[in-house]
Amino acid sequence: MSPPAGGAAAAADPASPVVLLAVQAAVRLLGAGHEDEAQLRKLQLKADPERPGRFRLGLLGIEPGAVSLEWPLESICYTIRGPNQHELQPPPGGPGTFSVHFLNSEEAQQWAALVRDATAEGQNGNDSTAPVPTPAMCPTSPPCSSVTPTPKATQPEMDLPQGSGNLKKEELATHLAQAIAGGDEKAAAQVAAILAQHHVALNVQLLEAWFPRGPIRLQVTVEDATSVLSSSSSAHVSLQIHPHCSIAALQEQVFSEFGFPPAVQRWVIGRCLCMPERSLASYGVSQDGDPAFLYLLSAPREVSGHSPQHSKMDRKLGCLFPQSLELPHNLQASSSSLPSPPQPGWSCPSCTFINASNRPGCEMCSTQRPCAWDPLTATST
């Protein structure tokens, strides 16, 4: 793109000491088609070395190959559309009006104040002794003709960028996190709108600092749902965990320490059947000694017999529940030929806990009793 009329290519030395302020914003041409994507650009205001008391506004490219533009400040029309939304109209013959969307509300306010002061200073004449405005100056002077704030009643809705090809998604995500942490609702909403418009997939998680401190000891009652002695096949273990860990991470820890695959684990904490993606803290785990229940379900067996994984699991079950291995040999032999005794109550379809027959819901996870379960039929069998 060639430099617009009344302007010139930006200076090659961005570290010049005359630069007053440089900020980043998402910039695109208004009136262009949707194929014209917003680009992350740097807005720069500096003193004009050839004209004391005057200033130049630059629109600098950040990515390799991007064209940088620059105009005398008095030759452009700069309009403030909203807290984070501005418009920049170069002199006639230029590329057209630019939509400028700031990612940071504080930078937007600082930039607008500096442009107002610099414009007012430039209108006072070419006096070389005039003070140069700084970013710390307050916008006490009234808006000049070339920096026009839009009245609140007529402010249009935020003009979001139409593309995401040149937007740095990681920077936008960082700005979103900073805005939320700083309590800046407007900035957070605007950045979130840009990310949502371009369907950017995010993984929003709390920082570990917001969780209770760890590690702590979780007291786990393990129930073996596969044992014929289900009423007495329980064991107690202590696990060292962090409250910010997810249930999925806890399942992997149990798999690593005891060999029980996550597929056979059902965790119940605080009378809730735990979901893998939620944290332990979300179920109230915060201090040493907090209780949890782990139910071990029966895993599907291969047609050819036990797999090495099942053999390992059986050995671990034997260590946790030694009483199941101390049955008399004749009882073990007869148990295979005799039908199993009827289970009192009904089995929860979610956590497999055996509930009393008169309970309408599961005592552990509050799941409703299956409608198909009939206490008379269960007793007769």
Curated annotation (Swiss-Prot):
Q: Which SMART domains does the UniProt record give?
A: ZnF_RBZ
Q: Where are the zinc fingers (RanBP2-type)?
A: 342-371
Sorted alphabetically, which Pfam families does this protein's record hold? LTM (PF25393), Sharpin_PH (PF16764)
This protein's pathway reads:
Protein modification; protein ubiquitination
Q: Where is the composition biased (Polar residues)?
A: 121-131
The terms under GO molecular function for this entry are: identical protein binding; polyubiquitin modification-dependent protein binding; protein-containing complex binding; protein-macromolecule adaptor activity; ubiquitin binding; ubiquitin-protein transferase activity; zinc ion binding
Q: Where in the cell is it found?
A: Cytoplasm; Synapse
Q: Which biological processes are named by the entry's GO terms?
A: apoptotic nuclear changes; defense response to bacterium; epidermis development; keratinization; mitochondrion organization; negative regulation of inflammatory response; positive regulation of canonical NF-kappaB signal transduction; proteasome-mediated ubiquitin-dependent protein catabolic process
The entry's protein name is Sharpin
